[in-house]
């Protein structure tokens, strides 16, 4: 974890920081207040950080936060990865948005389907959807960190393109690489509560039975 005088990171952003490779230029997509960009530049972990946001207000806040780091941080206003040229940054962080939005951003930038890029993804919602999409589109999870921030569970994912597309099973989509991590039982309980609610609305049949089996498996994992 960084030790510079940049703003303190919450557990979610600290986990994202740790997945960024030292010595590589990074793009912070959805940089918001710029705290992660400041930490990456201020600690010397990245020689260049491209702080990017769709909205002028947050980008201006990021300019203020990152001002002490001069030209180590550059700023881009625009949507997703459209503000970058391929290869401009090889470590790409996308945080602060739901899984569907992250997927839309990646689908719109086919150049990230390349093993040179290190993706750090922090979905605010629907973690299982993102895990499924990554597997189907040929990305492998290289690491995953469970953490809590502002009372919510986050799964910070580190992914890289391999071209090995596969159909993941339901349990993998729900748990990824989180088994055995601190807090995983509580995380699984949250996932299971959503599954149980979903199952109540299903008619009797194969899907309802499959969801019931997943619920039982998550209960087993949560119990240790």
Each model region followed by its residue ranges:
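Class I S-adenosyl-L-methionine
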Residues: 2-12, 82-83, 88, 100-224
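S-adenosyl-L-methionine
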Residues: 1-24, 38, 60-86
